[in-house]
Swiss-Prot record:
Belongs to the class-II aminoacyl-tRNA synthetase family. This is Alanine--tRNA ligase. Its EC number is 6.1.1.7. One of its GO terms (cellular component) is cytosol. Binds 1 zinc ion per subunit. GO terms for molecular function: alanine-tRNA ligase activity; aminoacyl-tRNA deacylase activity; ATP binding; tRNA binding; zinc ion binding. Its cofactor is Zn(2+). Transmembrane segments: none annotated. Catalyzes the attachment of alanine to tRNA(Ala) in a two-step reaction: alanine is first activated by ATP to form Ala-AMP and then transferred to the acceptor end of tRNA(Ala). Also edits incorrectly charged Ser-tRNA(Ala) and Gly-tRNA(Ala) via its editing domain. GO terms for biological process: alanyl-tRNA aminoacylation; negative regulation of DNA-templated transcription. It is found in: Cytoplasm. The keyword Calcium does not apply.
Length: 852
């Protein structure tokens, strides 16, 4: 039975037992305490804790994609070196929320293992908690008593945290055979590999209080987990997950790419790559992007670890992106979004590979130099330089050292990292998030969530349910001249959410509404009052005219999203947005900058849609029905059971709770004002419509008139072309003066970057001239005079600090220096090292620009 059969067999088995199949939740959970979804129960956590009501039906089954890399649950270091550690894996599970309990859970598990998987009974063993006589006796109905083992809390008691739901658990083990495993640890309860845990059944029957006391839950629940990779290996008679059909096709592809056959004993690098490409593909397909911190940095670490293992196999060029096709081929049948995102994922992987490969050789050279001097502990300073200059994550350096039996000075690395973060934040001042300490829980318990009526009305009379000061503490009144927050029973003011800014307006005869925000489900308006108001007052509310402009920009954002997916491809996914009365901003997944032709096509698409005068239509639909109708939902967004669906003619259909136009013609004109990069794989478009677009056009007309007046012509383009010709002639003359000043620039992320040695001239003046020529520039020049080296760097609109740049170059040349972030100078004296300094300075800047 192959892996697809195991997955489908499991889900279909529990479907036949009345369980509803729940699709795999996103790898990025809606849970601030977790980096990634790392277990099958994570999507159901709020149900187990009672934060949300139990679903109907209250029994579910799923095959959940999981990642364990970074944070508390981190398997990264072991991946490739053991038979069963993975960063990415699939967890099969069945769940009961206060419905069936131990008897049925045990019976279902036994039936599936013996009747569906047909595992031999004489290879199966079971463990229970030492105090769980009930589970022991229930198992004894199915399996011999001498095959049931009792263990303590460490092995057979599960809890979500220090407090909350918990209970004993029971595990099913598979005996892989004494003929294959016969170490002293190969016994039930030992640390050997002979007895392999394949299924864990958690009996959530207690609530643990802060004092450690266990109290029975009124409705005990079931949470189970079975690793697809382990079961697949067993079904195929393999002793390592990597030898199964889940991984061997990927390992075979790696062997083709490096031209070397795979063998298990020396194949750690093959296994690392085959595991890591699964994590990388799924995370990118679900919208995570490479970044300098958080989840995006974990993603970068995983890929760079794989690239380095490719380097060990002799692969010195981008190759990981080529494996994306195989992952999609193997898993796209069940996870169909992989096929839709494949092209974009490949491009993002390829670009990230190029970034790292640009510095890996220099980084490895530095690593090996330090390694030669290391006896036990590798320098933390060098590890930090590898991270900061060459893009080597700390765990990659530690991984390389582990192969040599050495360790890195993590304490020193952490110290340097903390110093860097402190410098970065030195200028920041903030008051913290006062809203986190507000009296919201009390308001929710007393009133529940208040209603928003602004879809249908912009004016109404409403009653004050509660007042809060600006620290979000409850007060009975606000006096004349004071400001604070108001909770109305029903409010026409839209609270900021989904990228749409909050409404403003007025309270007739009382004061102004400055902002509207949503806190813990409560719609609260910030007000400034001219006379006293108190709890219980009934007031006249009016939303400002800005609402209409906000609605136009919000609807234009939907049309823009549709245009991007139509012109660039369906891989485009929203990565963020901001909608205001005079502008919109839309962030989206796309691997490279848009061309001027693409921007023109997008702008035309939106304006053509506006000209169609199509009606806007909103419907309230069941979430699944909405998705099935073709409505676009944000990946990973948590939606209610019933959702609001907005259709703009036949052009756009999305889930959206914001406010919109009645007809797309209200949008008027649409202009794109800027396209830029946000991070690796994420682009941003800024645009205007309606009155803001008209104001922009008026501004252009005024500027054109001013240019015509300055050039003293009614045909400014003719004059401009003439001037451009004259400039071109002057440049040619300058170029002919001599090429000693010529700089070969490289374009990286829209920045011109160059490092060069010049023979003559004033290097500061040269830098100033280049700053005037380019919108975004990073340049470092060196000049030798009488065995001394002058260094100068200039930076304009680029993520490099000139002071740091000249310092690193000067250090190589036995000198020093520094200066501002935009301009700095230094000196050196080691002339024979000047070529090395040029190379290192170039790589330093390249890494900074590529990872910006």
């Amino acid at each position: 039975m192959q892996n697809l059969d195991v997955r489908e067999a499991y889900l279909n088995f529990f479907k036949s037992k009345g369980h509803e199949i729940t699709p795999s939740a996103p790898l990025v959970p809606n849970d601030a305490t977790l980096l990634f979804t790392n277990a099958g129960m994570v999507p159901f956590k709020s149900i187990f804790t009672g934060e949300v009501p139990r679903p109907t039906p209250p029994i579910r089954t799923s095959c959940q994609t999981c990642i364990r890399a970074g944070g508390k649950h981190n398997d990264l270091d072991n991946v490739g070196y053991t038979a069963r550690h993975h960063t990415f894996f699939e967890m099969l599970g069945n769940f009961s929320f206060g419905e069936y309990f131990k008897k049925d859970a045990i019976a279902y598990a036994w039936e599936f293992v013996t009747q569906v998987l047909k595992l031999p009974v004489d290879r199966l063993y079971v463990t229970v908690h030492e105090s769980d006589d009930e589970a022991f006796e229930l198992w004894a109905r199915h399996i011999a008593r001498d095959r049931i083992y009792r263990f303590g809390d460490h092995d057979n008691f599960w809890q979500m945290g220090d407090t909350g739901p918990c209970g004993p658990c029971s595990e099913i083990f598979y005996d892989q055979g004494g003929e294959h495993f016969n170490t002293p640890e190969d016994y039930m309860g030992g640390d050997g590999d002979r007895f392999l845990e394949i299924w864990n059944l958690v009996f959530m029957q207690y609530e643990r209080s802060a004092d450690g006391k266990l109290s029975p839950l009124p409705k005990p629940s079931i949470d189970t987990g079975m690793g697809l990779e382990r079961v697949t290996a067993i079904m195929e008679g393999k002793f390592s997950n990597y030898d199964s059909s889940l991984f061997m096709p990927l390992i075979d592809e790696v062997a083709k790419l490096c031209g070397k056959p795979y063998s298990y004993d020396s194949g750690a690098s093959y296994r690392v790559i085959s595991d890591h490409i699964r994590s990388v593909t799924f995370l990118l397909a679900q919208g995570t992007t490479f970044d300098k911190e958080g989840r995006g940095y974990v993603l970068r670490r995983i890929l760079r670890r794989a690239i380095r293992h490719g380097y060990l196999l002799g692969i010195k060029e981008p190759f990981m992106y080529k494996l994306v096709d195989k992952v999609c081929e193997m898993m796209g049948g069940h996870y169909t979004y992989l096929n839709e995102k494949k092209a974009a994922v490949k491009e993002q992987v390829r670009l990230e590979e190029e970034r790292f490969l640009a510095t890996i050789a220099s980084g490895l050279e530095l690593f090996n130099e330090e390694l030669a001097k290391t006896k036990e502990i590798f320098s933390g300073e060098t590890a930090f330089k590898l991270y900061d200059t060459y893009g080597f994550p700390l765990d990659l350096t530690a991984d390389m050292l582990r192969e040599k039996g050495l360790k890195v000075d993590e304490a020193k690395f952490d110290e340097l990292m903390s110093e860097q973060k402190a410098r970065a934040k030195a200028a920041w001042k903030g008051s913290g998030d006062k809203s986190s300490k507000g009296d919201f829980k009390q308001l929710l318990e007393e009133f529940g969530e208040n209603k928003f009526s602004g879809y249908d009305e912009l004016e109404r009379q409403s009653k004050i349910l509660a007042l809060l000061d600006n620290d979000f503490k409850r007060v009975q009144n606000l006096r004349a001249g004071e400001s604070g927050w108001v909770m109305f029973d029903v409010t026409p003011f839209y609270a900021q959410s989904g990228g749409q800014t909050g409404d403003t307006g007025e309270i007739t005869g009382v004061g102004k509404v400055l902002d509207t925000q949503k806190f813990h489900g409560l719609n609260l308006s910030q007000v400034e009052v001219g006379k006293q108001i108190k709890t219980g007052d009934v007031l006249n509310l009016k939303v400002s005219d800005a609402r209409a402009e906000i609605a136009r920009h919000h609807s234009a954002t939907h049309l823009l999203h549709a245009a991007l997916r139509k012109i660039l491809g369906t891989h485009v996914a929203q990565a963020g947005s901001n909608v205001e009365a005079d502008r919109l901003r839309f962030d989206f997944s796309h691997p490279k900058a848009l061309t001027s032709e693409e921007l023109e096509m997008i702008e035309k698409f939106v304006n053509d849609a506006v000209a169609s005068s199509a009606a806007a239509k909103t419907e309230i639909m069941d979430i699944e029905a909405a998705k099935n109708s073709g409505a676009i939902a944000l990946f990973g967004e948590k939606y209610a059971e019933n959702v609001r669906v907005l259709s703009l003619g036949n052009v756009s259909k999305e889930l959206c709770g914001g406010t919109h136009v009645k007809n797309v013609s209200e949008i008027g004109a649409f202009f794109i004002t800027k396209e830029s990069g946000v991070s690796a794989g994420v682009r941003r478009i800024e645009a205007v419509c309606s009155r803001a677009a008209l104001n922009l056009a008026r501004g252009f007309r005024s500027e054109l008139a001013e240019i015509s007046n300055e050039l003293k012509t009614n045909e400014p383009m003719v004059a401009i072309k003439k001037l451009k010709g004259e400039v071109r002639e002057l440049k040619d003359k300058l170029k002919n003066i001599g090429d000693s000043h010529a700089i070969a620039f490289t374009s990286i992320n829209d920045t011109k970057m160059g490092v060069a040695v010049v023979k003559s001239g004033d290097i500061k003046t040269m830098i100033d001239n280049y700053k005037n020529e380019f919108a975004s520039l990073a340049i470092l020049l060196l000049q030798v005079n009488d065995d001394k080296i002058a260094i100068a760097a200039g930076v304009k609109n680029a993520p490099i600090k000139a002071g740091e740049w000249v310092k690193m170059a000067a250090k190589i040349l036995d000198g020093n220096g520094g200066g501002r972030d935009d301009f700095a100078t230094a000196g050196g004296k080691n002339v024979p090292m000047i070529e090395t300094a040029v190379k290192e300075a170039f790589e330093f800047a390249k890494e900074k620009l590529l990872n910006a």
